[in-house]
């Protein structure tokens, strides 16, 4: 981790020096963040039980359970017949070849949650509250499996110590740094959204953030404490 921090620090220093040499440092708003986090942050929590479909095969009732068979055979008929898929890492995404079996498979997963390192199974109406309906949009999996924190469904035994793509706190929360000579030092612990970055950039450029359709539809605001009395000025 220290190596990564040192490399990032050196890269930012080069960037800042270039801005200063060009005489535009004072007029530049620097925003540093990440598109995703990693999980687990705590290495002591790391568990790698194997790929999800392989793990299903280790459950004692696997051979006699339809739900288990559907998962392990999801991709067998691709591309000749009905095609499903299981995508895993620090989350499990399951597309079923027969979507009418969604509840049956979800029930199986819930019944065997401890053996499969499952914290939550999302399907049906609950899934549609957050994502598009998988019956009408094939990009949405039929079932989403959120594993117990620290679990990575992988066959890697050595190199993989963290992953991203899931819904854990470490996956979905990242740091965000905003810098400009006009801004005093401040630590803000109020949660913000990375979707606020675009609106903030527009405001700093003197453009009404509501010009963005997403700002209007989702009620997105600019990042707080930047355009206060002693902060940045609109262009």
Predicted segment positions?
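Conserved structured core elements
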Residues: 2, 6-13, 22, 27, ...
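Sec-exported extracytoplasmic/periplasmic mature domains
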Residues: 13, 17-24, 110-114, 202-210, ...
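Short helix/loop capping segments that flank catalytic or ligand/cofactor-binding pockets
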Residues: 41-42, 49-50, 55-57, 153-155, ...
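Cysteine endopeptidase catalytic domains of the caspase/legumain-like
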Residues: 188-191, 209-235
């Amino acid at each position: 981790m220290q190596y990564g921090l040192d490399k990032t620090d050196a890269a930012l220093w080069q960037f800042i020096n270039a801005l200063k040499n060009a005489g535009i440092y004072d007029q530049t708003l620097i925003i540093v963040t990440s598109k995703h986090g990693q999980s687990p942050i705590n290495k002591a929590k790391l568990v790698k039980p194997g790929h999800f479909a392989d793990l299903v095969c280790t459950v004692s009732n696997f051979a006699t359970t339809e739900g288990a068979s559907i998962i392990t055979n999801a991709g067998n008929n691709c591309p000749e017949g009905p095609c499903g898929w299981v995508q895993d890492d620090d989350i499990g995404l399951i597309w079923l070849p027969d979507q009418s079996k969604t509840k049956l498979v979800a029930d199986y997963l819930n019944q065997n949650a401890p053996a499969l390192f499952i914290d939550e199974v999302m399907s049906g109406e609950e899934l549609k509250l957050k994502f598009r309906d998988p019956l009408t949009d094939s990009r949405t999996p039929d079932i989403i499996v959120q594993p117990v924190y620290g679990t990575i469904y992988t066959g890697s035994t050595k190199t993989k110590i963290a992953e991203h793509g899931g819904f854990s706190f470490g996956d979905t929360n990242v740091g965000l740094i905003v810098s400009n000579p006009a801004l005093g030092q401040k630590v803000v612990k109020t949660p913000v959204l990375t979707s606020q970055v675009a609106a903030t950039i527009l405001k700093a450029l003197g453009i009404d953030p509501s010009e963005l359709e997403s700002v209007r539809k989702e009620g997105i605001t600019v990042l707080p404490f930047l355009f206060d009395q002693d902060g940045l000025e609109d262009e």
